[in-house]
Amino acid sequence: MTTDFLFPKIADCSYVSCYCEENVWKLCEQVKRTRPEELAKCYAVFVSNEGRTVPLWRQKAGRGDDQVVIWDYHVFFMHNPLPNRCLVFDLDTTLPFPTYFHKYVTETFRSDLALRPEHHRFFRVIPADTYLIEFSSDRRHMRRPDGSWIKPPPSYPPILSNTNTHCLGDFICMSAGKGPGAVYSLSEFVHNFYKQPNMVAQNNK
């Protein structure tokens, strides 16, 4: 891999455990500040399904040799600078940071064929500039009924948009036509973002 990455070191990225949606928002913000010409090629990607039970492998919070965990949702960052070059920046993976799209998808999501339908993964892909404007969370989903925190929140103030105080559910929702961005099945997601070099060459003829 070349070392010309948007985020050379994972240690330089803002990270708070269990706040992946905010971690990715901060990555988008960093690109806008330091590499604005690349922002249009970047995406925030939410992974979930109707039952909010999505298995992911190679996760730091995972168990066993395969490091598998079942999340209600997960969020990662993608940079797609060229038709045949897409990089995934996941602050919670045990894979390299970043990882090429095909390797990340293959090892993190594997296949839906061996899973029950209720565990199939869907992906909401949101352009980074849209995510920066529309995402808003007052962190209510991380509070217990008594008001205490399930996990300690980030030290910075909540990320709030000008029009909404909490719209996280709109991003986690995987209903097509509702919420920002586009929703894909696993196979559709791969089809849209994984292009082999020879396929790109043929399409350009």
Swiss-Prot record:
Organism domain of life: Eukaryota
Entry-linked InterPro entries: N_Gln_amidohydro_ab_roll_sf (IPR037132), NTAQ1 (IPR039733), Prot_N_Gln_amidohydro_ab_roll (IPR023128)
Swiss-Prot/TrEMBL catalytic activity: N-terminal L-glutaminyl-[protein] + H2O = N-terminal L-glutamyl-[protein] + NH4(+)
Pfam families, alphabetized: Nt_Gln_amidase
Species of origin: Drosophila willistoni (Fruit fly)
Enzyme active site: 20, 74, 90
EC number(s) reported in the record: 3.5.1.122
The protein, known as: Protein N-terminal glutamine amidohydrolase
Subunit composition and interactions: Monomer.
UniProt keyword annotation of Hydrolase present: yes
